[in-house]
Structure formats: C-alpha cells, structure tokens
C-alpha cells in the first residue's frame, strides 16, 4: 500500500519507455546509467539481447508484440536499433506519443564484414525510424553527419518518387548528446611502457593493424608491455593469436576482465590505442583517458572532434602508428581532459532533454 504523498509523487513522475533492441555492452551501460541516475523519471525498460543483429533490427516489433506495458507513456526513448515505424504502426495508441530516437551508431557508416551480405534493410529501418521520431539525438557529430550523408547517397540511388529535403528535415530535429562515462581511478604509479588494448577483437576494430605495428615496434628493439583486454570469441581471433605467438613475453594480461580488474589495468596503462574503422563515440578510449592513459587514435571517425592532432595518426597506416607509438614510448604526452563526457557534466543535459516542457518538433 502506498501512502498518499508517495502515491502523488509516483503519479507526478513522467513515465518514459526506454526501448533498447540490442543490449550490447555500450547500450547496456547507457540504459543502466540513465535509469539509475535520472530517478525522478518513472522508467519502463524493454531490452533484447545483443545477438543475432539482422533479426534484432528487423524483428524487435514482433518480439515485443505482446510485451508492451498497458500504461501509455508520456515519452518513448528508443535506440536506433528499434524499428520505430513498424512499432508505431502495430500499436495505434502510440501514434501521438512523442519519441526521441537515440543513435549509438548508424547503419550508413557501419562497415560490413566478409561474413555479412550487403543489405539496405538495416538502413531503411533507421531512415523510417528517424522520419517517425520527433527528435533525433546522436552521440557525436560524426555519427550525425555520416547518417545524413548516407541518407543522401541512398536517396540519390532510388529511381523516382523521392521526396525533397529529407535530410534537411531530419537535421532540423537533431542534436548531439553523448553517452556519459564514469571516470576511472587514476593511479600515479603507472607502468611507463604499458600499451592498452580495451576493444572487442573484431573486424570493425581492425586489430591486425595494431598487431602489425607492435611487431614492427618490437623489431626495432623498442621495449614495451601489453594489457590485452576486451571481448573476444571462444576461438582465439587471428590477430590476438598472432600477438600471443610473436609477443608473448610482452603480455602482462590477456583476458576479458571484470570491472574491478578493468579499472586496475586502465589506471596502470600509459598509452591506449585504437585502430578502429568504425567508431561513433569511442567509449573505451574515453574511459582509458579518464584514467590518464594517453590516446593514440586514427585521424578519422569521431576522433578528430575529441582529440588534438598530437594524439592522432593516419588511418590504417601501420608505419604511422609504429612511429607515433615509438615517439610516445620515449616521451608520453599528458592525457587530454575528457571531463566534459563525465556523468556529472551530462546529467543535467540528459534531464533537460527528457523533461521537455514544449512539444517536440
């Protein structure tokens, strides 16, 4: 039983459905942070496991067909993995509910692996979802620009009956608001030559570029140590196997670790490297930099809007990465300030977005 004051407080709370159709690591951290931080909101969270990507992005309205709450929300916050247009079509009661469509990524700038077949379907899901939403929110400017450019390219390929100013209309209702990070503990006694890899060992992170640069560095006689973290398949990925075979004496840790150990190794690392060919916000690098690791990232994707020239190298260039690593190992620049991505700096911005007082456009 609720006391009258408690019941009034619950009734005064805004009810938001948080729909996340692909609970991967970064999507999960975002959803958990929102629901645990913005407690003045009455959250109703629906999520689907982060696997079977093609099925998830097209099948989520079917998976949720009989699972939506009976109470209609004040607002829907949906990730761009949600097939929003179909969801609204299947549930007419949601027709006039305002929706914020949040882009952790976009399918127009996502590199296909050799195991995937090309399909325009995921792009169309996000295009229709963006049109159906009241507001679009991106975690970086790169994410927004690549999405809008991708739509222009797609629409120019269509034979006829294409409406005018689609990208202009979408841009006018868009904004940038990053995923917040929790700063990691910063240790003063860092290992001066410890290089960190804290990304997934998958094709879109291009780990083979990292490995080849390390081997070149080793052949030059440069001393370094390695902390190899991040998710990996049960079968050791080829790039990781190559490191184990050629640089086993350099490795101090080689596993996906729990949160406590993750923070420990981030705080000990001096340099954190990315070789990604796909990155929309780069949370792993931001976390490491918050622990005062110095970033070394491609001059591409979201990185130019985050890090100065000194921290960047020519994309996919093994020699450039090797040279910059050698330079950083001899004299490591101070890590840049990333505090404007911290939870305490972004909480009010998220609160303002979700507690709007005027109709969304």
List the predicted regions and their residue ranges:
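Conserved donor-binding/catalytic core segment of Leloir-type glycosyltransferases
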Residues: 178-216, 226-229
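Conserved acidic donor-binding segment of nucleotide-sugar-dependent glycosyltransferases
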Residues: 310-319, 326-330
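Short hydrophobic beta-strand element within catalytic cores of glycosyltransferases
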Residues: 294-297
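Short alpha-helical donor nucleotide-sugar binding micro-motif in glycosyltransferases
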Residues: 264-269
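A charged, aromatic-enriched C-terminal amphipathic alpha-helix characteristic of glycosyltransferases
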Residues: 54-59, 330-361
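Nucleotide-activated donor-binding/catalytic signature segment of Leloir-type glycosyltransferases, i.e.
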Residues: 230, 238-257
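Aromatic "clamp/platform" in nucleotide-sugar-dependent glycosyltransferases that forms part
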Residues: 277
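Donor nucleotide-sugar binding/catalytic pocket of nucleotide-sugar-dependent glycosyltransferases
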Residues: 132-186
């Amino acid at each position: 039983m609720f006391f009258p004051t408690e019941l009034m407080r619950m009734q005064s709370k805004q009810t938001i459905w948080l729909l996340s159709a692909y609970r991967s690591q970064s999507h999960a951290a975002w959803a958990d942070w929102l629901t645990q931080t913005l407690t003045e909101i009455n959250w109703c969270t629906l999520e689907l496991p982060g696997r079977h990507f093609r099925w998830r992005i097209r099948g989520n309205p079917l998976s949720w067909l009989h699972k939506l709450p009976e109470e209609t929300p004040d607002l829907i916050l949906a990730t761009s993995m949600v097939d929003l247009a179909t969801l609204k079509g299947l549930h007419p009661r949601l027709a006039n509910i305002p929706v914020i469509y949040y882009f952790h990524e976009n399918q127009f700038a996502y590199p296909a692996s050799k195991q995937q077949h090309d399909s325009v379907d995921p792009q169309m899901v996000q295009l229709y979802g963006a049109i159906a939403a009241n507001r679009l929110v991106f975690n970086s400017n790169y994410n927004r620009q690549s999405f809008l450019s991708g739509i222009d390219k797609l629409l120019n390929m269509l034979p006829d009956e294409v409406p005018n100013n689609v990208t202009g209309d979408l841009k006018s209702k868009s904004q940038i608001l990053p995923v917040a990070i929790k700063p990691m503990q910063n240790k003063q006694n860092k290992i001066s030559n410890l290089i960190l890899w804290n990304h997934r060992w998958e094709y879109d992170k291009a780990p083979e570029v990292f490995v080849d640069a390390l081997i070149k560095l080793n052949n030059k006689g440069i001393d370094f140590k390695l902390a190899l973290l991040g998710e990996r398949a049960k079968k050791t990925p080829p790039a990781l196997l190559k490191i184990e075979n050629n640089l086993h004496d350099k490795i101090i840790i080689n596993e996906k670790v729990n949160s406590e150990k993750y923070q420990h190794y981030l705080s000990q690392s001096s340099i954190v490297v990315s070789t990604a060919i796909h990155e929309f916000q780069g949370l792993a690098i931001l976390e490491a930099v918050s622990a005062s690791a110095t970033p070394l990232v491609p001059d591409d994707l979201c990185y130019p809007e985050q890090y100065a020239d000194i921290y960047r190298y020519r994309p996919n260039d093994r020699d450039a990465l090797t040279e910059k690593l050698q330079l950083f190992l001899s004299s490591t620049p101070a890590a840049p300030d990333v505090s404007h991505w911290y939870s305490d700096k972004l909480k009010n911005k998220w609160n303002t977005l979700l507690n709007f007082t005027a109709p969304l456009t």
